[in-house]
Amino acid sequence: MARYIGPTCKLARREGADLSLKSPARALDSKCKLEQKPGQHGAARKGKLSDYATQLREKQKVKRIYGLLERQFRNYYKKASTKKGNTGENLLQLLETRLDNVCYRMGFAVTRPAARQLVSHRGVLVNGKSVNLASYQIKAGDAITLSEKAQKQLRVQEALTVAEQHDMTPSWVEVDSKKFSGVFKAVPDRADLPSDINEALIVELYSK
């Protein structure tokens, strides 16, 4: 499956936001001007976006934050629209309960791409069973543990240190860094999710 492997700064500038594609310990440097679009004429690209363009940019931003392709993202939207409640909130909750995202939230990896790799390399166990599917949906009460091999990886140990230093662990997960394990306590409410995402724009886009 195709994945973007180019400069993370380029993506961040395209969306005008930090997409959490770099470790908090290596934040986007001063050369990455988020207010300036990438390309030779990026500085000149100003002006008010149309409603459609604004909606499209928000969708692209969220896709890139969670590392999804269009078909995957659209499938999540379709699933969210069939559930009871607010479609936009349902969408974010589905994305947040992906196994790779939960591993990222627990601090087992410094970025979501790194968490996805950890999962695909069979470094993660859910309720004692090895799971290598990044999109696996985690439920409240599920226990996440790293394999013995993953626990010995320096990047995993460093990720946990960074998470503790930057107080990155959200309230809906519980982590025991010494045991390389955690519990997904509950599906997060909208108030607990990123405030810089306007999911209503995505709903408007797909509703057309």
Swiss-Prot record:
One of its GO terms (biological process) is ribosomal small subunit biogenesis. Keywords: Ribonucleoprotein, Ribosomal protein, RNA-binding, rRNA-binding. One of its GO terms (molecular function) is rRNA binding. GO terms for cellular component: small ribosomal subunit. Residues 97-160 form the S4 RNA-binding domain. Belongs to the universal ribosomal protein uS4 family. One of the primary rRNA binding proteins, it binds directly to 16S rRNA where it nucleates assembly of the body of the 30S subunit. Part of the 30S ribosomal subunit. Contacts protein S5. The interaction surface between S4 and S5 is involved in control of translational fidelity. This is Small ribosomal subunit protein uS4.
